[in-house]
C-alpha cells in the first residue's frame, strides 16, 4: 500500500495521503497492543499486512511475508517525506513526530545486540523472498535482513532531524537514538558482488525478485 502513495505529493495529490495517515494513527493503538503482547515492547509496530480495522498482528499464510515487523516503521518514513515535501511544521509536530516517536520506542526494546555489537531485528524476513541456507534448506525467517536495517537507518535519521527542526532539546534521547543508529549493521556486499539481501550471504532462491 505504501508504495502506491509515493507519487501523491509529486503529482499534486498530497491530500490523498490523509487516509493512509489516518490508518497509521489507528495502527498506533492496535500496534501498541501487538508490541506488548508479542514482543513485550513499548511503542507500537505493524507487520506486512493490515486491514480496514488496522490489524497490526501478523496475518496471512505465505511464509515469507506475515512475520515482517517493519510495516509501521516504513509508513513512518512516508509521513516524514510528506513533511519534507510540504514543509508543514504543524504536520511534523502534531502528526508525524508523535507517530515516529512510538515507532522508535518499539525498536528500543525490540532490537537485539549480537556479539559484534550490532543491533539486529529478528526474527524477521526479507518480504516476499526466500533464501537457501548453507545447509541447503529453503527459508525466510532470519536476523537483520538488509531492508530492515535500511528502514531503521531512515527512521532514526528522520526522527533526529525532526527533533532538530522543531528545536527540541532532548540530549539524552538524541544520544540514545544516535547510538542505536550507529550500531545498525552496515550494508554488506556478497561474494558475487551483490548487495546482500540478508545479514548472512545466503543464496537467493528467486534471483530476479
Short names for language-model regions:
Residues 15-18, 90-94, 98:
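Short, solvent-exposed positions on alpha-helices
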Residues 34, 62-69, 200-209:
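Anion-binding catalytic surfaces of enzymes that hydrolyze or transfer phosphate/sulfate esters
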Residues 11-12, 28, 50-52, 123-129, ...:
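Short, flexible loop/turn elements at secondary-structure junctions
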Residues 1, 41-94, 108-175:
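The feature captures the catalytic groove of carbohydrate-active enzymes
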Residues 22-35, 98-114, 180-192:
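Long, well-ordered core segments of solenoidal/helical folds
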Residues 172-209:
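Long, low-complexity segments enriched in small/aliphatic residues
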Residues 2-45:
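Carboxylate/His-rich catalytic cores and anion/metal-binding grooves
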Amino acid at each position: 500500500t505504501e508504495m502506491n502513495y509515493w507519487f501523491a505529493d509529486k503529482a499534486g495529490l498530497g491530500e490523498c495521503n490523509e487516509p493512509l495517515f489516518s490508518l497509521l494513527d489507528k495502527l498506533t493503538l492496535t500496534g501498541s497492543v501487538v508490541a506488548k503482547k508479542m514482543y513485550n515492547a513499548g511503542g507500537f509496530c505493524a507487520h506486512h499486512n493490515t486491514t480496514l480495522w488496522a490489524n497490526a498482528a501478523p496475518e496471512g499464510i505465505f511464509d515469507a511475508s506475515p512475520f515482517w515487523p517493519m510495516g509501521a516503521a516504513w509508513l513512518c518514513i512516508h509521513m516524514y517525506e510528506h513533511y519534507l515535501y510540504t514543509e508543514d511544521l504543524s504536520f511534523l509536530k502534531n502528526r508525524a513526530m508523535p507517530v515516529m516517536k512510538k515507532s522508535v520506542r518499539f525498536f528500543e526494546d525490540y532490537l537485539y545486540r549480537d556479539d559484534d555489537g550490532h543491533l539486529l531485528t529478528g526474527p524477521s524476513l526479507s518480504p516476499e523472498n526466500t533464501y537457501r541456507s548453507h545447509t541447503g534448506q529453503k527459508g525466510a525467517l532470519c536476523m537483520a535482513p538488509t531492508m530492515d536495517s535500511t528502514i531503521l537507518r531512515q527512521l532514526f535519521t528522520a526522527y533526529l532531524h525532526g527533533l532538530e527542526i522543531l528545536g527540541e532539546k532532548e540530549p539524552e534521547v538524541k544520544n540514545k537514538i544516535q547510538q542505536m543508529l550507529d550500531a545498525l549493521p552496515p550494508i554488506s556486499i556478497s561474494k558475487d558482488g551483490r548487495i546482500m539481501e540478508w545479514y548472512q550471504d545466503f543464496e537467493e532462491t528467486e534471483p530476479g525478485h
